[in-house]
Amino acid sequence: NYARGKVLGGCSSINAMIYMRGQARDYDQWAELTGDPDWSWAASLEDFKAHEDHYRLDNSANSLDPKIQERARLHGSGGEWRVEKQRLRWEILEAYAKAATQTGIPETDDFNGGDNTGAGYFDVNQRSGWRWNTSKAFLRPVKKRPNLEIWTHAHVTKLNLSMDADGQKRCTSVEIRVKGKDHTVEAGLEVLLSAGAIGSPHILQLSGIGCPEHLASVGVEVEHDLKGVGRNLQDHLQIRTVYGVEGVKTLNKMASTLMGKAAFAIEYALKRTGPMSMAPSQLGIFTKSDPALKHANLEFHVQPLSLEAFGQPLHDFPAITASVCNLNPTSRGTVLLKSADPF
């Protein structure tokens, strides 16, 4: 089961708030495969900077400090997307980072320069201790535009195709259910489908766009043969390891009493700091599984807490969690229909 951000802001409203660009080689590979230089790291970096409001550049306009100039080469200021330093540090995480450097992994204070190899704290998408999602950043400032309507509680059920004058199929309308009532929205120019790696293939296949054999097997009439729909799903396996610790603060211990929980709430209410302001994963480590590799292919998320599964209570003993995931999985999955029912 995939967690789905069915809310304004999408997954940025429910995720771990970590601000993380890909490696430069990822974007350069896309540019090479597509033949489009706009996908390159150099071009993408300018787009990142244009929309960033990065804490490293706060109050540093026109600075001649070489360090600040280097930050300005990699980051932007005044954009919609706020990036901040985490507002909490943990002794146990500092020790973990030090252990990483002792194995030869370099220390870093910025994972977003194109080569994320290193150990350090993640930057987060927050503003003054509050989650900063794409709805707050991009949608809220323009929601009063006369040419924009925002529908909530709306579920897209089908894209309707028509043949245009030159014999090309085009999406000309969208069927939507809003609070139990069906609507058809006509497209004046174009339809943009942006429902994510799970939602987009789901909607396309419900609309008869996909592999004919699969669509026929669930009773969907084929509108357009496009066998790649729902194929090539990529995701990274994450393995969580829990380590019991002694003599240091952990969230498990601090949250084990009513007084501890109350202290969290009071600190957050008064100062927007403390455990209630923290990202679930605070410390990151990017490294190689084999020294012969050119780039980091493993990522560690290190947390000052432990639990059986996300959404379940913290363990009743002091512990930390170090999760590791593969950045470049070679396995591929599918997103296919179980039935023709959009719900």
List PLM regions with ranges.
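N-terminal glycine-rich phosphate/pyrophosphate-binding loop and immediately adjacent elements
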Residues: N1-H51, Y55-S60, K169, E221-G228, ...
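Short loop/edge segments at beta-strand edges and connector loops
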Residues: T152-A154, V178, H224-L226
